[in-house]
Amino acid sequence: MSNVKSSKPVFPENAGSNEYAASLDAADPLASFRDKFIIPSKANINSKKLAKPGLSSDPCIYFCGNSLGIQPKATAKYLEAQLDTWSSIGVSGHFVDLEGSPLKQWQLLSEQAAASMSKIVGAQAEEVAAMGTLTANLHLLLASFYKPTPTKHKILLDWKAFPSDHYAIESHLAWHNLDPKQSMVLIGPDEGEYEISTEKILSYIDEHAESAALILLPGIQYYTGQLFDIQKITAYAQSRDLTVGWDLAHAYGNVELKLHDWDVDFAAWCTYKYGNAGPGAMGGLFVHERHGRVDYSEGEDAPKFRHRLTGWYGGDRSVRFKMDNNFKPIPGAGGWQLSNPSAIDLACLCASLSVFDETSMAELRKKSVMLTAYLEHLLLKDTTDETRPFRIVTPADPEARGAQLSVLLKPGLLQNVSQKLQEGGIVCDKREPGVVRVAPTPLYNTFTDVWKFVSYFKAALDEPELKN
């Protein structure tokens, strides 16, 4: 969970004014980061033709970083450097560092990315690997960490897990000839609620400790935006002899993480949401150092290491090209790599990470807490539970959520409200049957963005056709 220790921000009476929002922007120490991104224009987001960015001075309000982050300006520079390397020196790009390029030689690129990602997730550099995509990485990690026995075979997960997680777990159970109806345990909220309390999760762990082998939860629940207490849940589950994994798709680049200190067994994430690495970008995985050790006590040719699905790129670089078919894994998460990673994908990833390298998750989280609290304050301002046609289903506690607020609309409102928002140049995510997921992102969103969004959102709710 986040290390934010301050209480929930309190806003003055004039917080509903555009002038107040502008004053928050003027005092924002991260304001300059917005200029490191290409903000889509209002005209372009509603256009059906391919358009060049930067032709309009009227940017949209982009609150969809929880689905896909926007493009860093560095991306084009990094991609151009990668293409120039390929065109100018060909295969030598694997082994030669070029002066003037922001990128290392190709065989070191994944390590360059992993070193930066490790700071985002609170890990040692060797505990992180830049590779694959989220679901593929979850499959690799489950193959290594899920070790069912006749008595301990269950996997615990949340009741509304993203389908890829659900499918991955089902397939691993089937791989071991287990019935998901017997071996998959869904942890859900109380009837009529959306938040799953830590106490309820711990009670499920207690209830199934004798028969469960592993628990896999999201760091942040994608639908509700709830941030789980990763540290407490991890420690408790491990005390009951469960292996603990985390899907950090919505936590990476969003909240402070300390995976090493929290003793997490394994984790995986994508990088295209708050990470801004591009659609379908390369993902990352974490394996705690205690699981990534390679023991040579019985000789150089008899390494002992945690079982995993192996590939040549996970072999130690010093022997990778010896072709003797004696696998000696890279110590740490790098030993889970399979194939030569795409240098083009890594260029996009490294470009996005170059922005994070200029700040810290602590600073980003500080602004994020303020942005989301301001959004919540304006949404609830001058309304009551009885009068407002929506409910915020994300926890009110800043330490139990990330950037996102999930706004549940009354039945029948979602399509029209979503259409009105898009017509107004606002990009946010909708989830059936009635949720608008709004995610102000500290790297490129402003408090004025929040003010404008709420003004337009409430105006959309006041449209006559929505009141009938």
Swiss-Prot record:
Main localization of the protein described in the UniProt heading: cytoplasm
Swiss-Prot/TrEMBL GO biological process terms: 'de novo' NAD biosynthetic process from L-tryptophan; anthranilate metabolic process; L-kynurenine catabolic process; L-tryptophan catabolic process to kynurenine; quinolinate biosynthetic process
Source domain of life: Eukaryota
Positions contributing to pyridoxal 5'-phosphate binding: L134, T135, F162, P163, S164, D165, D247, H250, Y272, W312, N340
GO MF annotation, one: kynureninase activity
Classification via HAMAP family: Kynureninase (MF_01970)
Matching InterPro entries: Aminotrans_V_dom, Kynureninase, PyrdxlP-dep_Trfase, PyrdxlP-dep_Trfase_major, PyrdxlP-dep_Trfase_small
Complexes and interactors: Homodimer.
Name assigned to this protein: Kynureninase 2
Record GO cellular component, one term: cytoplasm
Enzyme Commission number(s): 3.7.1.3
Known cofactor(s): pyridoxal 5'-phosphate
Positions carrying N6-(pyridoxal phosphate)lysine: K273
Family of the protein in this entry: Belongs to the kynureninase family.
Keywords (A to Z) from UniProt: Cytoplasm, Hydrolase, Pyridine nucleotide biosynthesis, Pyridoxal phosphate
Compartments in which it is found: Cytoplasm
Pathway: Amino-acid degradation; L-kynurenine degradation; L-alanine and anthranilate from L-kynurenine: step 1/1; Cofactor biosynthesis; NAD(+) biosynthesis; quinolinate from L-kynurenine: step 2/3
Function, as annotated: Catalyzes the cleavage of L-kynurenine (L-Kyn) and L-3-hydroxykynurenine (L-3OHKyn) into anthranilic acid (AA) and 3-hydroxyanthranilic acid (3-OHAA), respectively.
Catalytic activity: L-kynurenine + H2O = anthranilate + L-alanine + H(+); 3-hydroxy-L-kynurenine + H2O = 3-hydroxyanthranilate + L-alanine + H(+)
